[in-house]
């Protein structure tokens, strides 16, 4: 275990109210990443509790409450709560009778979150960290979004007002866009939050189709178009994707066209574009080139201090240290010889060692000692390269010098009512299982309104772990999936655990075996074996309030 490692609570822990934040503070965590559905009013109060608060501010969001989506695991056997979401919410759905929705068939697909204009409210509240979704996004996307937020933060602390310019907003939309909303964070309603028409990147509209002939589409542009831009024509039964490899204007091949120009672009015919359809730009090569130039001109480099020793009869030695105290030392394979003619100068050593090549470092301080020696540049370069490589390894490894630490949990063992589901081949043994009714605490309790007055209760999240319940069992919504999680919940007062519905028989057996081997007794555990499974907890109703049931096009849902 790592007693000095800072602990952060993931959004998948479904911490969405003040009692959850208070509980995790008392557990010694450094930071809580709140559920993405948490409104600003609760965030403001959470920031006063005395633990760092991190909030989602930009990027893809889920329609289900954070940590409460079982649809991906149910349909694709991939846990959305453990980083393997199959994105079932981005699929097409119809009513059970097969009829379609007038707003679009992507009824579960939300727009992306973008609260850049609301940033002062979050900073005023005391939020410590802004979380920006960037999984599987290109580096240019990360650069542009981070640059935008960095500029906004700097303006805020300069006591000025920041608004995203129309040009920057356009750039963000070109990078990735399926609509923006303020989400639940600032109380956008369901019509403002959903992207039912399309679930994927739509970019910006740049023109309208005039005609299609012989593998070319004629378009009147409303914005700039550059050669090799990525394009999409909104079409049915699916959109037409293309690249502006060849652009013709007045029968001449050009590499750029501007608003109001009429151009022909080579275009696939499946499906063939029709007059009046909208042309959208999904990749802007001009923007990407600008970002690449910015990244090269203003690289983010890590400052280093460097020392060297160049003494006769010893290996050449280089020591580097970063601002966080990581240190690396490298020595040459050969021994330094005394100079027979002109000795290498310290200026030459400094010039050679100051080059960092492909490593993201900047030498801000360099000094050392050198005698009258012969030292080839190749040896200086190789020793410097080794030192930087070792520093890379040191920075990527969390090192603790505290020695082996004991690890112990005070488990609430209840031996007279122990119950275990044992999986042997295809049989299930329910001997000694007790069957009784238990009250299930609300999965969503933002305002801490629910007061427990029951002796037997199913708790829904860590927000309910307060050691005041007489007899509580962790419900499937807590998504407990390994022996350590079981032990922790039992140590906090739970008398039993219902395994996550994402787990199969073999996974349950492995968790129980590991628990028994580690702690020496069999925990009281349950598993859902009959009844309808809740696959999503959604904060409010669909856009169509008359919807009672939906189905996907593959009859899996």
Model-derived regions, located:
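Active-site pocket-lining/capping segments in soluble small-molecule metabolic enzymes
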Residues: 1-15, 19, 33-129, 136-557
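Alpha/beta enzyme core
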Residues: 18-27
């Amino acid at each position: 275990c790592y007693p000095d490692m800072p602990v952060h609570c993931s959004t998948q822990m479904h911490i969405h109210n003040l009692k959850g934040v208070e509980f995790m503070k008392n557990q010694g965590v450094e930071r809580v990443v709140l559920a993405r559905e948490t409104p600003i009013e609760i965030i403001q109060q959470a920031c006063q509790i005395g633990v760092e608060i991190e909030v989602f501010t930009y990027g893809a969001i889920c329609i289900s409450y954070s940590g409460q989506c079982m649809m991906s695991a149910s349909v694709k056997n991939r846990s959305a709560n453990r980083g393997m979401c199959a994105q079932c919410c981005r699929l097409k759905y119809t009513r059970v009778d097969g009829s379609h929705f007038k707003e679009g068939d992507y009824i579960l697909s939300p727009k992306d979150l973008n609260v850049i204009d609301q940033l002062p409210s979050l900073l005023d509240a005391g939020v410590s960290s802004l979380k920006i979704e960037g999984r599987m996004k290109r580096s240019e996307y990360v650069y542009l979004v981070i640059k935008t937020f960095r500029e906004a933060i700097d303006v805020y602390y300069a006591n000025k007002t920041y608004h995203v310019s129309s040009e920057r907003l356009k750039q963000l939309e070109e990078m990735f866009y399926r609509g923006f909303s303020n989400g639940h964070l600032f109380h956008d309603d369901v019509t403002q939050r959903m992207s039912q028409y399309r679930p994927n990147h739509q970019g910006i509209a740049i023109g309208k189709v005039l005609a299609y002939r012989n593998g070319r589409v004629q378009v009147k542009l409303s914005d700039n178009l550059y050669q090799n831009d990525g394009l999409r024509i909104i079409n049915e039964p699916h959109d037409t994707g293309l690249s502006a490899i060849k652009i013709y204007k007045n029968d001449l091949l050009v590499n750029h066209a501007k608003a109001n120009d009429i151009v022909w672009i080579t275009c696939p015919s499946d499906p063939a574009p029709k007059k009046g359809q909208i042309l959208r730009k999904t990749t802007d090569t001009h923007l990407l080139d600008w970002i690449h130039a910015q990244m090269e001109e203003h690289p983010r480099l890590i400052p280093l201090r460097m020392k060297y020793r160049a003494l006769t009869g010893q290996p050449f030695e280089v020591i580097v240290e970063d601002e966080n105290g990581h240190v690396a030392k490298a020595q040459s394979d050969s021994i330094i010889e005394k100079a027979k003619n002109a000795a290498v100068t310290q200026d030459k050593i400094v010039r050679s060692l100051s080059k960092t090549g492909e490593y993201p470092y900047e030498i801000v301080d360099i000094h050392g000692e050198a005698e009258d020696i012969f030292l080839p540049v190749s040896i200086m370069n190789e020793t410097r390269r080794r030192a930087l490589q070792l520093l890379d390894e040191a920075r990527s490894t969390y090192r603790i010098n505290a020695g082996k630490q004991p690890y112990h949990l005070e488990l609430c063992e209840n031996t007279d009512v122990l119950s275990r589901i044992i999986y042997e081949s295809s049989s299930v043994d329910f001997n000694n299982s007790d069957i009784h009714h238990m009250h299930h605490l609300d999965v969503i309790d933002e305002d801490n309104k629910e007061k427990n007055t029951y002796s037997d209760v199913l708790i829904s999240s860590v927000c309910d772990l307060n050691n005041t319940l007489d007899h509580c069992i962790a419900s499937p919504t807590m998504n407990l999936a390994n022996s350590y999680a079981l032990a922790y919940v039992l140590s906090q007062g739970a008398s039993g655990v219902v395994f996550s519905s994402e787990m199969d028989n073999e996974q349950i057996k492995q968790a129980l075996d590991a628990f028994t081997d580690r702690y020496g007794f069999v925990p009281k555990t349950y598993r859902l074996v009959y009844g309808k499974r809740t696959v999503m907890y959604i904060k409010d109703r669909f856009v169509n309030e008359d919807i009672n049931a939906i189905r996907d096009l593959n009859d899996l849902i």
